[in-house]
């Protein structure tokens, strides 16, 4: 297949995610297998090696692993190595969005995300349809697994939407959450995702006129970003997707458009067992889901960021500019 559009797919990867990120890169490689003009796709990796918040136990080994990935996969590497100033995924995604003038689509990659093989074929069709119908500013999302409340049903894959949701509040629920393929806490493989997607013979494409998405694998038309929609600087880390969602709503109003590819699954492995390795002093016996939440800096940073998120629009409340200490 020859692409008519240009793509940039950017991913921020912390040093402790290095043992997980190849699965994401491999999913992109598989999605590109049938593409004739791969020069139309720019894959960018921002390797965050900063020890501002957490110390790394094996930094040189991680650099070596990055070099191996660079030899195996075709992507551009950027590095953040300042130990005296924090840099987060929200910072990177703001910068990624600003590359909108160089492409037709900006895609938010994520180190624990698997993108579907059908990615480019679907997006090419959508752009053709959109242009013929004068829809130039839009978001595209793929099907997701069972989420925690009814508001997400519009995005859930039909194979999973009627399944039960398991929290991780009790040992029993944690066990079910980690062992049920439809659960967002279950670590799904490329092969399992491919099997689900192989069942789709005809696309179920729905359009919603209000923003609803998580940031993993988010597809944004460059014209939407040219409106100025972005992640506000007041949101430092947590809530970057929610802040961007509100920005899209503010910029587009009643003209907001989002394609939902219901029956093509993308995977967000939030609870991947290799999500947090090489962090000095971290209790490796803990479940991935609970590791970061026990860190004091994380709790503080989370409160600052989410507190600002609630003040973004239609408010005169001052933002919290507090510097988070190491």
Question: Where are each of the predicted segments found?
Answer:
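Hydrophobic targeting segments
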Residues: 5-12, 28, 42-47
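Short, well-formed alpha-helical segments that are part of the catalytic scaffolds
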Residues: 17-34, 55-61
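Short, flexible/disordered intra-domain loops and linkers
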Residues: 19, 51-61, 120-121, 151-155, ...
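Active-site acidic Asp-centered loop
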Residues: 48-50, 109-112, 143
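Active-site-proximal specificity loops/subdomain of glycosyltransferases
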Residues: 52-103
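Conserved catalytic core of nucleotide-sugar-dependent glycosyltransferases
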Residues: 97, 116-226
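Short beta-strand-to-loop acidic/aromatic patch adjacent to the donor-nucleotide binding site
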Residues: 103-116
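C-terminal catalytic/acceptor-binding lobe
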Residues: 195-326
């Amino acid at each position: 297949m020859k692409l008519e559009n240009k793509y940039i797919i950017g991913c921020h990867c912390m040093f402790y995610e290095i043992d997980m990120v190849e699965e994401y890169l491999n999913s992109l490689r598989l999605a590109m297998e049938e593409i004739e003009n791969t020069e139309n796709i720019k894959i960018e990796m921002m390797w965050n090696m900063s020890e501002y918040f957490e110390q790394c136990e094996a930094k040189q080994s991680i650099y070596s692993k990055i070099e191996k990935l660079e030899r195996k996969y075709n992507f551009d590497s950027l590095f953040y190595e300042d130990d005296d100033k924090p840099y987060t995924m929200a910072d990177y995604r703001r910068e990624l969005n600003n590359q909108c003038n160089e492409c037709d689509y900006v895609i938010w990659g994520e180190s624990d995300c698997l993108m579907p093989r059908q990615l480019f074929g679907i997006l090419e069709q959508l752009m053709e349809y959109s242009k013929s119908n004068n829809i130039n500013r839009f978001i595209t999302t793929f099907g997701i697994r069972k989420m925690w409340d009814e508001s997400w049903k519009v995005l859930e894959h039909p194979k999973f939407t009627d399944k039960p949701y398991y929290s991780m509040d009790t040992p029993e629920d944690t066990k079910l959450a980690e062992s049920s393929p439809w659960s967002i806490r279950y670590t799904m493989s490329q092969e399992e995702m491919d099997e689900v997607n192989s069942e789709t013979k005809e696309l179920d494409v729905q359009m919603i006129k209000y923003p609803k998405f998580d940031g993993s694998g988010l597809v944004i038309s460059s014209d939407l970003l040219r409106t100025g929609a972005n992640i506000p600087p007041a949101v430092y880390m947590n809530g970057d997707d929610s802040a961007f969602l509100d920005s899209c709503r503010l910029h587009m109003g009643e003209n907001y458009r989002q394609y939902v590819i219901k029956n093509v699954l993308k995977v967000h492995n939030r609870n991947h067992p290799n999500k947090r390795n090489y962090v000095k002093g971290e209790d490796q016996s803990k479940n991935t889901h609970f590791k970061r939440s026990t860190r004091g800096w994380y709790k503080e940073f989370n409160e600052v960021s989410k507190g600002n998120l609630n003040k973004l629009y239609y408010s005169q409340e001052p933002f919290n500019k507090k510097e988070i200490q190491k």
